[in-house]
Amino acid sequence: MSMWRPSDSKVYLPPVPVSKVVSTDEYVSRTSIYYHAGSSRLLAVGHPYYAVKKGNNKVSVPKVSGLQYRVFRVRLPDPNKFGLPDANFYDPNTQRLVWACLGVEVGRGQPLGVGTSGHPLLNKLDDTENGPKVAGGQGADNRECVSMDYKQTQLCMLGCKPPVGEHWGKGNPCTTGAAGDCPALELVNSVIQDGDMVDTGYGAMDFNALQANKSDVPIDICTSVCKYPDYLKMASDPYGDSLFFYLRREQMFVRHLFNRAGTMGDSVPDDLYIKGSGSNVKLASHVFYPTPSGSMVTSDAQLFNKPYWLQKAQGHNNGICWGNQVFLTVVDTTRSTNMTLCASTASTVTTPYNNESFKEYLRHVEEFDLQFIFQLCKVTLNTEVMAYIHSMDASILEDWNFGLQPPPSGSLQDTYRFVTSAAITCQKPAPPKEKEDPLAKYTFWEVDLKEKFSADLDQFPLGRKFLLQAGMRARPTLRAPKRTASSTSSSSPRKRKRTKR
C-alpha cells in the first residue's frame, strides 16, 4: 500500500519585507539658486613626530604631521533662516530648504616634498637583503637608529557625516593565555578624527596595544593607532551620508629588508627545512619586515588644487547636507616636508664649530583653502516624506521645529502665592537645556562658513569655473548708458511751399 509522506527538503520562507530606502532626488526639489562659500587660509604648525609638552604636562607644541587625517567639519547657515533674494519662491508652511553640495576644490599650499620618520632605537637585527654569509647572534639590545620615508597617499572624502575607519586592535581570547602569548586580533570600526594617523605601510593597527617594545615602528606611530578608511562599510550605508564620493591615490615600494630581534614566538616547522650544522644549527630570526617608501613625488599626479563636481553620489544621498554641515577628509603625504630649525645657545657664534652650541628643532606646516558650490533645494513636507525623514534621522525634523505634541495633562497643578518666600522651594523655572551635539566627543577641524556665502559666483575662482562648465553667464554689472533722442527741433528753417496765385 503506497503512503504519502512530505518532502524531506527544507522549506525556505520569503524574507520579511523591510522599508525601502529611496534616493533624495525623489523628495528633494532642486532650484536655480547657487551660492559660493570658501574658507580663509587654514594653517597648522607643529612637531611632526610627537606633541611637545612643558613641565606641567601641558602641550606647548601640538603634533602636526603630513601623515595625519585632516577632517574638516564645515558649518553651513540654516537656509530656512537665510536672507534670500526672493522669499516667495517657497512656502514655509509646507516646505523646508536644504543645501546640496555641487562642487568642491581643496587648495593645497606649500611645495611638494617627502617627509621622513624613524626611530633612534628601532628593532633592526640584520640586513636580510644583503646579509652576511654567517648571521651574528643576538645580544641583549640590538636596536639601531634607522629612518625611512612612508607610503604615499592622496585622499579626499566628502559626506555629511564623519568618515568611518577600520584598524586591528587587541581582542579578548576565549581562554586566558600565558605571558608572552600572541594577542588575539579584532577588527575595530571607529570614527576618523582630525589628527588620526594614516596607514604608513606598516598596517592599520593599534601599535600601542599590539607592540609592547615600542621599537618595531617609527616613533610617530609606535604609540598611535593607524586607521584606514572603511570603504566597504561606508559604501554599504543605506543612506550614504558618510561618503558622497572619494578620490584616492596610493603607491608604495619596498626600500630595505630587515628582520626583528627577540625570541621567536612561532617556531618554524621541521618539515620546511633541513637542519644544518655548525653556525646554522640555530635558525636566525625569521620575522622579516620591509621599510616602505612612497617613491617619487610629482605634480603630474596631484588630486588637489582642481575642482570636482558632484553630479551623482554613490549612495542614496545625492549631496544633500543634512544638519547644515559637511565633513571633508583630506590626506596628502606629497607635501610632508619636515623643516629643520636651528638656534644658537650663545649670543654670538663662536669658532671653532661645536655641536653643543646649537639646538636643532623639527616643525611641519600644513596649508589649506576650501571652496564649495552649494545649491538651494526644497523639501515638500507631506505625510510620507516626514515619516521617512523621521525614520532616517529624527533630529532633522527637530531642527525644522517639528515635534510630537505632548498629550494634555489631567493632573492637578500646584501654584504658590508667595513665590519669593524663603519658606517654600525655589519657584524659578529651570533654564531650557541646550541641544547636545552628538559629535562633541570627537575632534574635528571646525570651519564656520555661516557668514561666507555669496551669490556672486563670478567673483570667485571656483564660481567662475562652475559658471563655465554649467554654461551659465554672470549678470552684467556695468551697462552702457542708452542715448536719448533730442527733443529740440532742427536749427534750419523749413522751406515754405510755393502756392499759385
From Swiss-Prot:
Subunit structure: Self-assembles into homopentamers. The capsid has an icosahedral symmetry and consists of 72 capsomers, with each capsomer being a pentamer of L1. Interacts with the minor capsid protein L2; this interaction is necessary for viral genome encapsidation. Interacts with protein E2; this interaction enhances E2-dependent replication and transcription activation.
Gene: L1
UniProt record, GO biological process: endocytosis involved in viral entry into host cell; virion attachment to host cell
Annotated GO CC locations: host cell nucleus; T=7 icosahedral viral capsid
InterPro entries: Capsid_L1_Papillomavir, Capsid_L1_sf_Papillomavir, dsDNA_vir_gr_I_capsid
One GO MF term attached to the UniProt entry: structural molecule activity
General function of this protein: Forms an icosahedral capsid with a T=7 symmetry and a 50 nm diameter. The capsid is composed of 72 pentamers linked to each other by disulfide bonds and associated with L2 proteins. Binds to heparan sulfate proteoglycans on cell surface of basal layer keratinocytes to provide initial virion attachment. This binding mediates a conformational change in the virus capsid that facilitates efficient infection. The virion enters the host cell via endocytosis. During virus trafficking, L1 protein dissociates from the viral DNA and the genomic DNA is released to the host nucleus.
Region span, Disordered: 473-501
Source organism per UniProt: Macaca mulata papillomavirus 1
SUPFAM superfamilies in UniProt: Group I dsDNA viruses
Entry keyword set: Capsid protein, Disulfide bond, Host nucleus, Host-virus interaction, Late protein, T=7 icosahedral capsid protein, Viral attachment to host cell, Viral penetration into host cytoplasm, Virion, Virus endocytosis by host, Virus entry into host cell
Composition skew (Low complexity), residue ranges: 483-492
Main location class: virion
Domain of life of the native organism: Viruses
Subcellular location: Virion; Host nucleus
Designated name of the protein: Major capsid protein L1
Family note: Belongs to the papillomaviridae L1 protein family.
